[in-house]
Amino acid sequence: MKTIVRLFAILMVLISSVGFVGSAVAAELNPVDAKLTTEYGQKIDLNNEDVRGFRQLRGFYPNLAAKIIKYSPYDSVEEVLDIPGLSERQRQRLEANLDKFVVTPPSSELNEGGDRINPGLY
């Protein structure tokens, strides 16, 4: 009898673990996670980052970051230098940090609600 109970318990554990495999496969299909494995995960995306993402760069948060967001979307990283109303100092900061930016197509998953200035994270 004990052997039957043990076999039944092992069988139940094996059957219940099959559901976890399906969950792991579904998690791999997330488009945002897939994007993080590209250059987007290492650099600031000018078309998808909210204002808080620019805090890691000195002199960008919040004013210069807000200008960058206001005039997006961009087709290339260098296009950010054409923002109207940039001061000379802001232009210098942008030029010095061009290698820290990337441009990808705007994504609704990353811009939910369309508010990149105040994403509601407090």
UniProtKB/Swiss-Prot annotation:
Regions crossing the membrane: none
InterPro entries: PSII_PsbU
Keyword Coiled coil assigned: no
Subcellular location, record wording: Cellular thylakoid membrane
Protein topology in the membrane: Peripheral membrane protein
Keyword field: Electron transport, Membrane, Photosynthesis, Photosystem II, Signal, Thylakoid, Transport
Annotated signal sequence range: 1-26
Key word Mitochondrion present: no
An example Gene Ontology biological process: photosynthesis
A GO cellular component entry from the record: extrinsic component of membrane
Cysteine pairings via disulfide bonds: none
Record text on subunit structure and interactions: PSII is composed of 1 copy each of membrane proteins PsbA, PsbB, PsbC, PsbD, PsbE, PsbF, PsbH, PsbI, PsbJ, PsbK, PsbL, PsbM, PsbT, PsbX, PsbY, PsbZ, Psb30/Ycf12, peripheral proteins PsbO, CyanoQ (PsbQ), PsbU, PsbV and a large number of cofactors. It forms dimeric complexes.
Membership in a protein family: Belongs to the PsbU family.
Chain's role: One of the extrinsic, lumenal subunits of photosystem II (PSII). PSII is a light-driven water plastoquinone oxidoreductase, using light energy to abstract electrons from H(2)O, generating a proton gradient subsequently used for ATP formation. The extrinsic proteins stabilize the structure of photosystem II oxygen-evolving complex (OEC), the ion environment of oxygen evolution and protect the OEC against heat-induced inactivation.
Full protein name: Photosystem II extrinsic protein U
Species, as recorded: Crocosphaera subtropica (strain ATCC 51142 / BH68)
Name of encoding gene: psbU
